[in-house]
Amino acid sequence: MITTLLRRSLLDASKQATSINGILFHQLAPAKYFRVPAVGGLRDFSKMTFEKKKTSEEEEGSGDGVKVNDQGNKGEQLIVSYWGVKPMKITKEDGTEWKWSCFRPWETYKADLTIDLKKHHVPSTLPDKIAYWMVKSLRWPTDLFFQRRYGCRAIMLETVAAVPGMVGGMLMHFKSLRRFEQSGGWIKALLEEAENERMHLMTFMEVAKPKWYERALVISVQGVFFNAYLIGYIISPKFAHRMVGYLEEEAIHSYTEFLKELDNGNIENVPAPAIAVDYWRLEADATLRDVVMVVRADEAHHRDVNHYASDIHYQGHELKEAPAPIGYH
């Protein structure tokens, strides 16, 4: 009985001490930094403290706020990140703010319009002939479907043309990791090509508004082409690059026809999209015709790079043995 009384006395004393400590804690700790829940453990206390701090930072407009103003978004958003990752504040040469987050000023360039557009690789081997006629066979259904709607045709073309560089760069990236060896810069060159083709697409999306069934066609064609090209590149890189070279030759032809329609007045020569003006460093009063001219020049450079890559393989070498044409515009 004495033992039981002693236990009860110790338990009551412990409860009183805990209550006194809690009162002192509330009196001494500033409310700005601590919010102790009536029920719950340290986990709830930590969560409530972080939420209090986050709310306080949002109200006070702390430096962790990141303004996001990407083109195409509705208005501006204020994103508060615990990690404190902030975008660089970039300005143009004239001091105005750089408004594009998808590319930076040092990634822009002036296209080389003097490139020879008529260069052609004459197919001599069986793989070359197969690649050539495969690409030629794709022109007929494309002409039938799009006819003279060259804006939508360009969108379809660029969704396909952006695939080979990504596939080739991805496979070379894995090969470099697997073999513990450098790529000779070809990973960067091929991914650069894919990004350039994607920028073509983003530009023409500002000009042409594809219909829903054209968007569905893009999804289907891209899915089929990606898997087919992936298998083809694994089996024979020289065949894959040769086919892309011929595909780029067809792109040059397509954009040449686009220019003819613009010159004949069948397509309105609207002002160039703002993204195109900054990406290709065009004049402020540039038009759609100027955009088509620089895009066609890009395709000619991609033609050269892929035929060159195929020639390297045909000569019994690997791409890493030849310096990659990085920044070849």
From Swiss-Prot:
| Mitochondrion in keyword set | yes
Q: Where is the transit peptide?
A: 1-45
What does the note accompanying the cofactor annotation read? Answer: Binds 2 iron ions per subunit.
Give the bilayer topology: Multi-pass membrane protein
EC numbers, comma separated: 1.10.3.11
Give UniProt keywords alphabetically. Answer: Disulfide bond, Electron transport, Iron, Membrane, Metal-binding, Mitochondrion, Mitochondrion inner membrane, Oxidoreductase, Respiratory chain, Transit peptide, Transmembrane, Transmembrane helix, Transport
Localization, UniProt: Mitochondrion inner membrane
Q: Name one GO molecular function term.
A: ubiquinol:oxygen oxidoreductase activity
The Swiss-Prot or TrEMBL record lists the needed cofactor(s) as: Fe cation
Q: Where does the UniProt entry say this protein principally localizes?
A: mitochondrion
Q: Name one GO cellular component term.
A: mitochondrion
Record's Pfam families? AOX (PF01786)
Q: Which reaction does it catalyse?
A: 2 a ubiquinol + O2 = 2 a ubiquinone + 2 H2O
Q: Does the keyword Electron transport apply?
A: yes
Annotated TM spans: 154-174, 216-236
Q: Induced by what? A: No effect of antimycin A. Up-regulated by ethylene, high light, glucose, cysteine, mannitol, salicylic acid and cold treatments.
Q: Which InterPro entries match?
A: AOX, AOX_sf
Q: Where does Fe cation 1 bind?
A: E158, E197, H200, E299
Report the top EC class in one word. Answer: oxidoreductase
**Into which family does the record put it?**
Belongs to the alternative oxidase family.
Please give the PANTHER family that the UniProt record associates with this protein.
ALTERNATIVE OXIDASE, UBIQUINOL OXIDASE 1B, MITOCHONDRIAL-RELATED
Task: Tell me how this protein assembles.
Answer: Homodimer; disulfide-linked.
**Function of the protein:** Catalyzes the cyanide-resistant oxidation of ubiquinol and the reduction of molecular oxygen to water, but does not translocate protons and consequently is not linked to oxidative phosphorylation. May increase respiration when the cytochrome respiratory pathway is restricted, or in response to low temperatures.
What is the protein name given in its UniProt record?
A: Ubiquinol oxidase 1c, mitochondrial
Organism annotation: Arabidopsis thaliana (Mouse-ear cress)
Taxonomy of origin reads: Eukaryota, Viridiplantae, Streptophyta, Embryophyta, Tracheophyta
Q: Which gene encodes it?
A: AOX1C
